[in-house]
Amino acid sequence: MKFEAIAVEKIPLIRKGDDLPYIICERIELQDRDIIVIASTIVAKAEGETFRLEDITPGEEALAIASRTGKDARFIQAVLSRSREVFVEAPFMLVTTLAGHTCVNAGVDESNIEHGFLLYPPKNPDSSASKLGERLESISGKKLSVIITDTNGRAFKIGQTGVAIGIYKIKPIKRWIGEKDLFDKVLEITEEAVADELAGAANLLMGEGAGGIPVAVIRGLDYYCEEEISMSENYRPEDMDVIKKGLRCLQKKN
């Protein structure tokens, strides 16, 4: 058994309104059940999620956080505008985004964008993935899956890795519960984060910085799924999330 990870090269600088699926299909011949992995940065740019820092007016909460942390209140406001809960204010803002993803700065970024601008993440990554997937399937005539990725750090390790934030026609979790291990024991809790694993594999090719490649294709793995799927399946239920519970307890003490 083997699979391929293929970099889709020569993607131009993306601007608002660009037809990403057409640009991708011009550069690679897609096959049935390919998994197209797309960096959230170019999805956001195509959707027009770029804003001038100088045009952002901070509200009371942003000003209060800025006074405590010394950060730019305009950047804080940008993060708050895409957040539904703030857990940590410094040395970075750890938040849960409107889409349910818990990450640093709500994915708002000052890199890979012109000076003085901020790049917001897609508002609804699952919806973005669906639109891209439907258009890619229409152009190519193939059955395809899509993963939109972002780069995240890990709570207890140094370094970043690619993770899935939006999906189309692929289940984010593979449940091994009920299967048997090598010693005939029944697995009770094993759930494999397939979408994140694929995002991480693609990120090895996609890279970071000026030399980054924003699109890769995973070929040879059949994770195609006709069901309507959401990344919400990948997020731990609130009553089971002990880390969030702990962070909320710390907030109350402070």
From Swiss-Prot:
| Pfam family name, one | F420_ligase
Identify the cofactor(s): Mg(2+); Mn(2+); K(+)
Provide the cofactor note recorded for this chain's UniProt entry: Binds 2 divalent metal cations per subunit. The ions could be magnesium and/or manganese.
Ordered alphabetically, the record's keywords are: GTP-binding, Ligase, Magnesium, Manganese, Metal-binding, Nucleotide-binding, Potassium
Q: Which domain of life is it from?
A: Archaea
Q: Which Gene3D superfamilies does the annotation name?
A: CofE-like (3.30.1330.100), CofE-like domain (3.90.1660.10)
Keyword Repeat included in the entry's annotation = no
By its UniProt entry, which SUPFAM superfamilies does this protein fall under? CofE-like
Q: Which family does it belong to?
A: Belongs to the CofE family.
The record describes the protein's role as: Catalyzes the GTP-dependent successive addition of two or more gamma-linked L-glutamates to the L-lactyl phosphodiester of 7,8-didemethyl-8-hydroxy-5-deazariboflavin (F420-0) to form coenzyme F420-0-glutamyl-glutamate (F420-2) or polyglutamated F420 derivatives.
NCBIfam families the UniProt entry points to: F420_cofE, PRK13293.1
Q: Name it.
A: Coenzyme F420:L-glutamate ligase
Q: What is the organism of origin for this protein?
A: Methanosarcina acetivorans (strain ATCC 35395 / DSM 2834 / JCM 12185 / C2A)
